[in-house]
Amino acid sequence: MIKPPLPLAQAAHWMTSFINPNNHALDGGRATSALELETIGALGSMVGYSKPLGHLTSGGTTANLEALWVARQSNTNTIVLANEHAHYTHSRMSEVLGIPFQAISSTENGAMNLLILRDVLEKLQCKGIKATIVATLGTTGMGAVDPLADILPTARAYGARIHVDAAYGGYFTLADLSKEVQRHFTAMDSADSIVIDPHKHGLQPYGCGAVLFKNPEEGRFYKHDSPYTYFTSDQLHLGEITLECSRAGAAAAALWATQQKFPYVRSGNFAQRLNESLEAAQGLKNTLIAQGWWVLEPELDICVFSLSGLKASEISAKNRMFFEQKAEENIHLALFSLSQQNCPWEMEWDVSSLTVVRSVLMKPEHNDPALWERIARI
């Protein structure tokens, strides 16, 4: 999952690094702090937040940590509920924060099972516990999209908080998604917090993540004093609303420059790059199906597929052999495990999971029929 950064972003990052600004306090990065606030405004507008509180982070792990920390600060008697395919960050950060964590089973397409979620919320309500629900828009393994638009009314009925992990998929809200998938992306504006990684599909060098809060009043949870900083100005110092202290201003400069070149608008040049990734996933899917492969329907730009067969163990072995064969051909794929509930194909389940092949089509050169043929060729 490494997308080439925009050369403009690399140049802005490189040039800014010569003055080495620190966006913790205004006296360490006055210009880049202003740029960071602009980048957060642009990200907020993209997801439908009118006046978001937020900042850049080193990546999605820290961004999700902060979102879960604010959730805990707003309700100390909470539990984190997330799709079983959610990024492992959530279970790890819940452990760090001392918050109970529970994985929610998924449906066949890898999205959170709404019926099971509702049952869990009902049981928690009987115990007087209000949950923090993590809805993932683009799981790392399958690119699955949790049904956010349907989770929201259920969550509100039980007094639950909603955090959206759109670290991988967030930018796709600008793309030409299917009507059903777009419905869930459009619902992001009703979430309490959102995480997006500009260093995934935002054309940024590593590391650049972002956390956004819909309610600016939640900045009160960050309130602290510092004997070393914050005394040079009555203006907001970004360090006052972050858990991280020192943060490179170069990341803000790079993202700001990219946003000037490619504004976040539907049907714009930036959105077209995302559409090419969607087209690549569909193109690979169709090529694989034509050659007899089993393929899951891609919701974003991640394609999961498998050779056919009779037994899960035999199919898994064939898929692993195919993976190794392609690596020798300089076609670098990945492996993933599917449980029976996530697998629509008929077979004998003589083992507990099926090893399948996974391809992330996030680079411009992936939208190429010749490449799809090379991947599908056995």
Predicted regions and their residues:
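N-terminal entrance/gating region of PLP-dependent enzymes' catalytic architecture
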Residues: 1-51, 325, 330-333, 342-344, ...
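Glycine- and acidic
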Residues: 20-27, 49-55, 78, 100-106, ...
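Conserved PLP-enzyme active-site core in the AAT-like
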Residues: 59-220
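A generic structural motif
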Residues: 108, 139, 261-263, 308-311, ...
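Active-site C-terminal subdomain of aminotransferase-like
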Residues: 177-178, 184-299
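Active-site-adjacent capping/gating segments
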Residues: 181-182, 343-354
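A glycine-rich phosphate-binding loop feature that marks nucleotide/adenosyl-phosphate handling sites
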Residues: 276, 296-306, 338-344
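Conserved PLP-binding catalytic core of the aspartate aminotransferase-like
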Residues: 294-330
